Amino acid sequence: RIREFADEDPIFELRIDGFAFDQTRYCNAVTHYPMQVASRNEVIRLTRLDGCIDDFYPVLKNQALLTPSEGQSQQIRIEAEDDSGNRSILEFRTIRQPAQRDFRAVCDSTALIVDNRRPFSHTAGEASVHIPAGVFYEPLFFSQSSRPAQFAAAPSVAVLSPLYSILDYDTPLHTAATVTIRAYVPQNLQPHTTLGFVRKGKVSYAGGKYKNGAVTLSTRTLGDFCVVADTVPPRIEPRFKAGEPIRTRSITFRLRDNFSGIGSYTATLDGEWILLERNPMQGTITHTFDDSRTPKGRSYTLQLTVTDNCGNKTVWKRTITR
């Protein structure tokens, strides 16, 4: 719990005793998200953003804004309390400066503003973005630019467009925005084309499929994007010795992919579909034998097909003996 007082008058309280699963992302509005991402510390806003729910704020007077008159002094106290009742207090005094010392900014009539209560769309060059109402928690200045793609990419990843910047990666989104980038892609690469997300000079898989000359992606992360193609199929590594009788109740495979990650997998024994259990943390899949369907002392044809998120496929087919 965090409380704020101005001259002993409570003007703000944040209290989160629990919330529904679908309210989880409102935590990005409770915090100052860019500062929190940059510092890896919890940074709490002592106000409520327009797009945040009221449930977390039992006390909120005038959005907790300080509005003293010229020359007026106020005593501010901030209390932070953990779940065990331990409390820290910060106190300081503020004084309203003369009006001539107030900050004044020159209005930029060319600036684009995203109203968080209304949908927003923008196209610049080959990149466009659509932001539905309610995606952002507050109005934002919109920025979009492009530049040559100069970053470290794996040799197996082909970069097929300039780099397009749409706002920043530390802009929190409550729901998804849609990013579309047009690019010429050779026909043989089109089934394997997607969007890459670039941060700190490295490209990672973002998603989306190439269709009608463009890649479209639904995303909760904005920042730097480019069109890329990945043509390297995933690797299948059996965790048992192929060709030797299998004496265990189960068999395990390790799946690896160079860029986009594993998209799907399926397996058959003598043409009959079998159940696989995936362990994403270890990058493995496991099949446990059913003695009634696959008795011991017989040989079977096992076929495992693995496809990555860019449509590259690997087939592992062997005869195994129980």
Segments predicted by a language model, with ranges:
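Proteolytic-maturation and junctional protease-sensitive modules
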Residues: 169-225, 264, 273-274
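Proline-centered linker/hinge motifs at extracellular inter-domain junctions
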Residues: 1, 231-235
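Short beta-strand elements
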Residues: 75, 83-109, 315-322
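Surface-exposed, short loops/turns at beta-strand junctions within beta-sandwich domains
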Residues: 66-72, 219-221, 291-299
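Conserved structural position at the C-terminal beta-strand
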Residues: 80, 304-306
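Proteolytic processing hotspots in large secreted/extracellular or virion-associated proteins
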Residues: 102, 108, 112-117, 147-194, ...
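Short edge beta-strand/loop segments characteristic of extracellular beta-sandwich folds
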Residues: 180-184, 250-258
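Exoplasmic/lumenal beta-rich domain surfaces
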Residues: 3-66, 263-288, 293
